[in-house]
């Protein structure tokens, strides 16, 4: 009859284990007649051991996310054209050396078309598509990282 394998806990301080402080499990395997014993050390699976093994992967993922948010940040020019418009008049301040911005002309024409504000349906599709695009990019990044971690040899 074969003797069962003895599993020691990670805190075991018996003479066979001499626990060194690292989370390991000693497994004794008795082969055949039980005269020969092989001792193997296997690492316990815990959240901290997985985090320690893949710490560089989490750091890379965090850097990629930071880079993504920095790149997707809107660019603001320091030189701009300012205009003010109400029902009684229109005023425009131009920055020195800057021609009239076509966006200002488009805004004036838009005001003439919608004097009480823009049509809310005008930019709805654009904002939805933009939000979905950013969400899809983050979802794709998460899926790629999960596939890499799960299928890591």
Curated annotation (Swiss-Prot):
Question: Predominant location of this chain?
Answer: host cell
Indicate the transmembrane segments per the record: 51-71, 128-148
Superkingdom, taxonomy of origin: Viruses
The Gene Ontology biological process terms listed for this entry are: transport of virus in host, cell to cell
Q: Which ranges of this chain reside in the Lumenal compartment per its record?
A: 72-127
Known partners and oligomeric status? Interacts with movement proteins TGB1 and TGB2. TGB1-TGB3-TGB2 complex formation is enhanced by ATP hydrolysis.
Supply the domain comment. Answer: The 2nd transmembrane domain is involved in plasmodesmata targeting.
Tell me the protein family, please: Belongs to the virgaviridae TGB3 movement protein family.
Q: What does this protein do?
A: Participates in the transport of viral genome to neighboring plant cells directly through plasmodesmata, without any budding. TGBp2 and TGBp3 are necessary for intracellular delivery of TGBp1-containing vRNPs to plasmodesmata. Can gate plasmodesmata and increase their size exclusion limit. Induces host actin cytoskeleton network thickening, which probably plays a major role in virus cell-to-cell movement.
The protein, known as: Movement protein TGB3
Q: Which organism is it from?
A: Peanut clump virus (isolate 87/TGTA2)
What lineage is this protein's organism placed in? Viruses, Riboviria, Orthornavirae, Kitrinoviricota, Alsuviricetes
């Amino acid at each position: 009859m074969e003797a069962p394998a003895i599993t020691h806990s990670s805190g075991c301080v018996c003479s066979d284990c001499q626990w060194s402080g690292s989370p390991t499990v000693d497994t004794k395997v008795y082969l055949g007649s039980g005269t020969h014993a092989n001792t193997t050390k296997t690492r316990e699976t815990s959240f901290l051991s997985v985090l320690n093994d893949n710490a560089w992967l989490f750091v890379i993922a965090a850097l990629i996310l930071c880079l993504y948010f920095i790149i997707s940040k809107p660019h603001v020019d320091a030189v701009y054209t300012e205009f003010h418009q109400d029902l009684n008049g229109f005023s425009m301040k131009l920055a020195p050396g800057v021609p009239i911005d076509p966006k200002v002309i488009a805004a004036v024409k838009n005001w003439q078309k919608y004097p009480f504000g823009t049509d809310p349906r005008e930019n709805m599709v654009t904002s939805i598509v933009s939000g979905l695009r950013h969400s899809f990019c983050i979802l794709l990044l998460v899926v790629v990282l999960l596939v890499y971690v799960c299928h890591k040899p």
